[in-house]
């Protein structure tokens, strides 16, 4: 059984395991040439699949290191800032947070993105903390 592990928030990377043994692993920065690459590890993921000679259709599980429930905590913090009398602090947080929230929201569509980008697959997708 193949299992693919991903990190995306910083130092994006992919690792492919078969029956508990590491087959391939790579950081996206090796391909993108961007130190501490932030984003989806497309090239690292493709490298892992190529090293094993498989496609995404052979992968049973994909795990993403991310805790989606943290959004609730961050939203609560933003609302408490709104309630405070310091409107400039709230405005600064909103301006810095919009790109982050947009990237977090896209995490929920990753299974669809992976199927479209890598050609289908019946894998199970897991958020791993």
Task: Tell where the protein language model's regions lie, with residue ranges.
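Short acidic/glycine-rich loops and adjacent helix/strand connectors
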Residues: 1-129
């Amino acid at each position: 059984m193949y299992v693919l592990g991903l990190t995306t928030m910083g130092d994006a990377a992919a690792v492919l395991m078969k029956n508990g043994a590491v087959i391939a692993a790579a950081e996206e920065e090796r391909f993108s040439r961007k130190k501490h690459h932030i984003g989806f590890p497309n090239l690292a993921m493709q490298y892992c699949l190529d090293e094993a000679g498989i496609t995404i259709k052979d992968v049973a599980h994909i795990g993403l290191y991310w805790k989606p429930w943290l959004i609730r905590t961050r939203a609560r913090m933003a609302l408490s800032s709104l309630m405070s009398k310091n409107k400039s602090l709230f405005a600064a947080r909103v301006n810095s947070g919009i790109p982050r929230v947009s990237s977090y929201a896209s995490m929920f569509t990753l299974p669809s993105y992976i199927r479209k980008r890598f050609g289908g697959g019946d894998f199970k997708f897991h958020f791993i903390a």
